[in-house]
Amino acid sequence: MLGYEVVIGFETHAQLSTQSKIFSRAATAFGAEPNTQACAVDLALPGTLPVMNRGAVERAIQFALAIGAQVSPRSIFARKNYFYPDLPKGYQISQFEIPVVVGGEVEFYLDGEKRSVRLVRAHLEEDAGKSLHEDYVGQTGIDLNRAGTPLLEIVTEPDMRSSLEAVAYAKELHKIVTWIGICDGNMQEGSFRCDANVSVRKPGAPLGTRREVKNLNSFKFMQQAIDYEVRWQIEQLEDGHAIEQATVLFDPDSGETRSMRSKEDAADYRYFPDPDLPPLVIADDWVQRVRAEMTELPRVMAQRFVADYGLSDYDATALTQSHAIAAYFQAAAKACGQAKLASNWIMGDVARRLNTDEIDIAQSPVNAAQLGLLITRIVDGTLSNNAAKQVLDALWAGESPDVDAVIESKGLKQMNDSGALEKIVDDVLAANPKNIEQYKAGNSKALNALVGQIMKGSQGKANPQQVNDLLRKKLD
């Protein structure tokens, strides 16, 4: 953009899918009445002590294994000191110097090209409560239900260079945490919160001053916010103004970012080890137990699809976007024995209909077995591709659950009578001598015109390949 390079890093808070909080037994369910899920520990009453939730630690280990990161054998909890009304203790329990997860990377595709973003760390911490402003005129309500909810904060290197790349990374990260079941990924409920650190610089120059963009509760808003912030920073620099480090909020209504506060550095939080919590020690046998219990990872499943089904890397990655898509593909491929065709139909015609209806594949009106039979009818010559799409339309609309019944009722069965087809071909050739002359003169489009006439004469039931073969046999 105007000779500037965009530099983006992400901090993502993934709410871990435990039933109780990270340091107490209080429930983590979303939507309860305010302050009904906050116990003495969450309220920071005198004499209470935090007790580590084993499930939160195991989910952090799962994440490390999923991204090829190192699990720290010994990590430390620290107090992050700041004052806010919805933080009863006056500090947040987090990790600073030694996090539970170190390194790793997230790989994804953008425009068919494989990309990767390196991770710095992922650390465990507790969430704060919520300040409620809308229902209180001139006052602020405090809801501590969320206080103490376990979070995994995932921090990247500043490896992304566009809003498109940033969104592709965020979608892949979202896929990973939901696939392995450590987070439900609900962005509207705040289970998956992304903050983008955005800066710009001239190519080859040192990193510019970053501004942290918050309130990115959808992938659409994420792209809009980053694009606006990049334009704003470039305009400021072009006008001779310096960029000041700050935290900004994205307003979806105006499509603009506005400053919330000056951005703090680590020193402002005065981190120090929490004396109430011992070091978190994770033995290798614990890591191996977690590994043994984990589901097949999406990248491993994608590699299997390439090896077993002969799919491309791109197709295999697309079909492992969720457990539901992968299961649907495998069931359809098994039903028809044609994995590549199943892949093409799912990524093409089925995906288009899902997008139009704004539903996911688990809600598809056409199940994998039906799609598999439909593909079988193409392979065995019963249906042409165009006729198969008409059958899919009928199945999707709920006209009948039976593939063969739809084919019969709509008269879509492909013409396999070679004698009848040859008569249609002869009739078309007799009626179109000009096209024959043009074809023999080297005009290949003339052959297409003849094919079209024959398909029309057969009411679309002729096999296009048979038609082409028969025409060439008669004309060449």
UniProtKB/Swiss-Prot annotation:
The keyword Transport is assigned to this record: no
Enzyme class: ligase
Domain of life assignment: Bacteria
Any GO BP: glutaminyl-tRNAGln biosynthesis via transamidation
Pfam families the UniProt entry points to: GatB_N, GatB_Yqey
Single GO MF annotation: ATP binding
Claim: ATP-binding is one of the keywords in the record: yes
Keywords of this entry: ATP-binding, Ligase, Nucleotide-binding, Protein biosynthesis
Family under the similarity heading: Belongs to the GatB/GatE family. GatB subfamily.
Role according to the record: Allows the formation of correctly charged Asn-tRNA(Asn) or Gln-tRNA(Gln) through the transamidation of misacylated Asp-tRNA(Asn) or Glu-tRNA(Gln) in organisms which lack either or both of asparaginyl-tRNA or glutaminyl-tRNA synthetases. The reaction takes place in the presence of glutamine and ATP through an activated phospho-Asp-tRNA(Asn) or phospho-Glu-tRNA(Gln).
Protein name per the record: Aspartyl/glutamyl-tRNA(Asn/Gln) amidotransferase subunit B
